[in-house]
Amino acid sequence: HFRRAPLVWAGLSAGWMMITLALVMVPLVGGVVANLLQPVFFASFAITARKQLAGEAPEMGDLFLGFKRPLRALLNLGAILLAAELAIILLLTMLGLPGAGDEEIATVADYVRLLKGKEWILVVGFVLTAVVKGALWFAPALLAFHDLSTAHAVRWSLFAAVSNLGAMVAYGVALTVVFVAGALPWGLGLIVAIPMMVASTYTGYAAVFEEAAPAEEPTPA
């Protein structure tokens, strides 16, 4: 998808990131709203990819296609993701991860010093985050293309992730390699890596659900 219209996908990715960053800068509620809207934007990416596959040209306005789908279900999914992320942060704090509010932290060097010997906590956080993101990876597309409740979409996404664990791990590793390579040396490669990631969100969904036998397709709860 990205190779067929790289400039549009780069523009869609930039628009998504700019909106997200702008929301995060809003005091109190901005971060919450930004998190709630993430599944909506990823639904937009999936819809755009399917549209492109059908022979239609993607457009910048496609960034908001997700808002034309069952918005409440997508926002509920965002709330689930936010709750999971907060639970992970709470767990890491309980395990002893230094926090931004720690009075001993004034510089990056202070944080590195306090983190010494606790690097394993970061590994735990990375693994838990990857598990949550992976388990819910298909949910935005499921809500965009099927008449499902949020809970049912989450169940189908989890089932698909577990059933295709090897492929999910390989995809995650490949994505990590692409992002690490893109971030070096000055992050210029992310201009390509991020659009490739958002464009690929539909590919996995299509491989698992649209090529499945009819009896295996998701049905409404």
Question: Predicted regions: what is each one?
Answer:
Residues 1-221:
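Hydrophobic alpha-helical membrane segments
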